[in-house]
C-alpha cells in the first residue's frame, strides 16, 4: 500500500510538471526556461482592442506582410487578412498553439485551408512551428508584431537591425527591449495606452526601422 501511494504521488508530480505554465511554451530546440531568450513560457492572448490599436498605429493595409513572433493561435494574422487582405506569417514553438491556429481556419471560414504536419497555410496566412530567433526570411516583413518579454526582445533587436528593411513597423504589446543593454537601439516612434474588458492599461509601442546609416 505504501509503495502504491508513492507511485501515485510520483505520477501526479509528473503530470503537474507537464501541464504547468512553465512548460507550456517549451522550445523545440531544447532551450529551457533558464535561457532568458526563451523564458516566455505562458501564452496570454492579445486582446482584440489592442490588436486594433496595433493595426491603427502601424497603418496596416493590403500590401503588408505581417510577421507575428510567438503568434499563439495566430489570431492577429487572421484578423489582418480578414480586415485588410494583408498577408501574415505567424511563428510559434508550442504545438498546442499550432493546433489552435488550425482551429482558427474554421472561425474565419477559410474553406481553402491546407494543413499538414506541424504547419498550416492559407493563401494569405501561414503558421510555422519554429524558432522566432532563426527566421531566415524576416527581412520580407513590412510589419512585425509581438507580445514577448523584454529578455527576448533585447536579444532579438540586433537581429532585427540586421535584417529588417527601413520603414518596417515593429509593434509590441506591453514590453520594450532593454535600452541600457542596447544603447544604440531604436527609440519608439509612438506609444499608446489601450483599455480592454480585462485591463485598463495595455501599452502598445511602435518602432520604425530607420535608414541603415541613421
Predicted stretch roles:
Residues 1-25:
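N-terminal export/membrane-targeting signals
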Residues 5, 22-64, 98-140:
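S-adenosyl-L-methionine
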Residues 63-72:
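Conserved class I S-adenosyl-L-methionine
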Residues 74-78:
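Glycine-rich SAM-binding Motif I of class I
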Residues 87-92:
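Conserved SAM-binding motif I beta-strand of class I
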Residues 138-155:
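A short SAM/SAH-binding and catalytic strip from SAM-dependent methyltransferases
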Residues 151-214:
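C-terminal substrate-binding/active-site "lid" region of AdoMet-derived donor-dependent transferases
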Amino acid at each position: 500500500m505504501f509503495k502504491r501511494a508513492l507511485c501515485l504521488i510520483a505520477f501526479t508530480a509528473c503530470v503537474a510538471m507537464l501541464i504547468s505554465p512553465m512548460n507550456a511554451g517549451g522550445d523545440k530546440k531544447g532551450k529551457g526556461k533558464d535561457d532568458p531568450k526563451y523564458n516566455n513560457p505562458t501564452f496570454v492572448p492579445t486582446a482584440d482592442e489592442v490588436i486594433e490599436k496595433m493595426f491603427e498605429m502601424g497603418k496596416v493595409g493590403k500590401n503588408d506582410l505581417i510577421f507575428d513572433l510567438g503568434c499563439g493561435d495566430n489570431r492577429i494574422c487572421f484578423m489582418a487578412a480578414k480586415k485588410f487582405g494583408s498577408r501574415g506569417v505567424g511563428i510559434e514553438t508550442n504545438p498546442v498553439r499550432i493546433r489552435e491556429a488550425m482551429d482558427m481556419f474554421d472561425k474565419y471560414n477559410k474553406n481553402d485551408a491546407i494543413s499538414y504536419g506541424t504547419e498550416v497555410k492559407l493563401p494569405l496566412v501561414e503558421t510555422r512551428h519554429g524558432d522566432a530567433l532563426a527566421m531566415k526570411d524576416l527581412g520580407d516583413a513590412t510589419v512585425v508584431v509581438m507580445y514577448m518579454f523584454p529578455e527576448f526582445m533585447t536579444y532579438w533587436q540586433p537581429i532585427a537591425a540586421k535584417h529588417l528593411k527601413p520603414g518596417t513597423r515593429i509593434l509590441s504589446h506591453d514590453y520594450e527591449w532593454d535600452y541600457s543593454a542596447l544603447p544604440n537601439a531604436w527609440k519608439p516612434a509612438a506609444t499608446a495606452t489601450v483599455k480592454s474588458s480585462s485591463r485598463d492599461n495595455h501599452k502598445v509601442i511602435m518602432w520604425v526601422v530607420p535608414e541603415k546609416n541613421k
